[in-house]
Amino acid sequence: PCFMGWIRGNRPPKVAEETLASTWALPSFAKDDRPDHPTPKPLDAFGIPMRQHVARGGLCYEPFCGSGSQIMAGEANGRRVFAMEISPAYIDVAVERWQADTGRDAILEGDGRTFGQVRTERLGDNADAPADAPDKDADPEPARKPKSAA
């Protein structure tokens, strides 16, 4: 599931004229179409609320980037997305997905190097190897360990 929320009293502005239902039925990725991530989201899971609440050129925040679905939705809908991800392997997945879709090079803002240049520096001779993403069919690790009966 994906959630959208706000702090009471700070409801986001409505920029679209249509009124939408609070739940949506969206298609999921077929197993063979997943972009190297166990739970990729359909682009409309992010595109619908973007179009409803964020003006073109506006900013969206993505604290759990995963395979980059919100980045891709922002690209498709003319919104900016500030994203982060704890897993370096999934950053590679998201950046490579964006580059493949847009035909552009991702640029490191700090010094202007491309993603490819940074990858070569970090991986050396293995720079052309695909990102070592976790098994997309494996169950994600639970957030908490179950309590043991002692």
Where are these regions (language model features)?
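S-adenosyl-L-methionine
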Residues: 95-135
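General helical structural elements
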Residues: 45, 83, 101, 123-126, ...
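Positively charged, low-complexity intrinsically disordered regions
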Residues: 32-35, 120, 145
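Core catalytic lobe of class I
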Residues: 1-91, 150
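Short, intrinsically disordered low-complexity segments
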Residues: 40, 78, 96, 118-121, ...
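Long, low-complexity, intrinsically disordered segments
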Residues: 135-150
